[in-house]
């Protein structure tokens, strides 16, 4: 293990461990971080963080935030985080389909913004559930 990763939520520390690699969902797409990455601060979108420990990928769902990468230490501050360990693929897929329908049928700006948030959350949970199955 070569990266020190700290995920913080408003209530405190969510995850604190070492890893070999991490993939973050930034506002401009995914970014992979390996040992000796250049220093970086980036905004994070709602999505799935993938952390590789001992040749195994561990997914976490995050609700947006920021990441600081410096000297093999990654500090992640997020609005919320969930472990993907209890997700079920069938329920996650159904919730994703329902959120997609709400987004497509939104009539007002407020409905669209609310539906977009639900869509991003449902999509992240569905992606994390698929990661657990593979």
Curated annotation (Swiss-Prot):
| One GO MF term | proton-transporting ATP synthase activity, rotational mechanism
Gene3D superfamilies hit by this protein: F0F1 ATP synthase delta/epsilon subunit, N-terminal
Annotated membrane topology is:
Peripheral membrane protein
Q: A Gene Ontology CC term for this entry? A: plastid membrane
Q: Which UniProt keywords apply?
A: ATP synthesis, CF(1), Hydrogen ion transport, Ion transport, Membrane, Plastid, Transport
Q: By its UniProt entry, which CDD domains does this protein fall under?
A: F1-ATPase_delta
Q: Which residues form a coiled coil?
A: none
Q: Where is it located?
A: Plastid membrane
Q: Does the entry feature the keyword RNA-binding, yes or no?
A: no
What are the boundaries of the signal sequence?
A: none
**InterPro entries with a match to the protein in the record:** ATP_synth_F1_dsu/esu, ATP_synth_F1_dsu/esu_N, ATPsynth_dsu/esu_N
Q: Which NCBIfam families match?
A: ATP_synt_epsi
Q: Which family does it belong to?
A: Belongs to the ATPase epsilon chain family.
Quaternary structure and interacting proteins, as annotated: F-type ATPases have 2 components, CF(1) - the catalytic core - and CF(0) - the membrane proton channel. CF(1) has five subunits: alpha(3), beta(3), gamma(1), delta(1), epsilon(1). CF(0) has three main subunits: a, b and c.
Q: What does this protein do?
A: Produces ATP from ADP in the presence of a proton gradient across the membrane.
Q: What PANTHER family does this protein map onto?
A: ATP SYNTHASE DELTA/EPSILON CHAIN, ATP SYNTHASE EPSILON CHAIN, CHLOROPLASTIC
The protein, known as = ATP synthase epsilon chain, plastid
Organism, by scientific name, is Prototheca wickerhamii
